[in-house]
Amino acid sequence: GVGLNCPHTPGISIDRPGIGVYSRSRTLTSGAVFSNLYNNAWGTNFTEWIEGSHAAKFYVWSYKNYSAPAALVTPAEETRTPLSAAYYAPTGLSFAYNYETSGELPDTQPGLMLDRKGVLVTSFNEHGNEAMIRLWEEAGSSGKCTVTLPRHSSFKVAYPCNLRGERTANAAGIPISNNSFDFEIGPNQPRTFLLK
């Protein structure tokens, strides 16, 4: 099979041009993929009023055996959010905030980990003694997921929340033991937790 990711032009159609047309039962007749460069249905001629050149990236890859996490989710996410790192060294400059640095940092240190492929961490924000974590199942399969937090985390309970970050009424917190917790996630479902 073939995987396709168009991060600059997410509006695509297969077999014939056009966006906004959906069918669960259509039989594909060709391998033609049309990408809507301007991501609209009105055919605005942007080149008439936006100067310069236009470019878009397309990533195409093949796979031998289909598995949504390995064939689609992981390769697409790697093209959208490539690995990045940051290095901090105090500068002594008056306009820069110089964080307290003492001791040595390890050469490597594991961060947040999930026990299954196809579930993405879409946000992890710490605020004082709390943190909000959002996970999204993208492979279309339900089941248990285990989150392992960074080594020195002090969180004890994960409370289910809605997409606004508000605790779900009557939902009991999930105990965090050995820096990890388990929860059930449905196909293509987002799950948000407040860690305390």
Question: Each predicted region: which residue ranges?
Answer:
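C-terminal (or distal) subdomains of carbohydrate-active enzymes
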Residues: 1-196
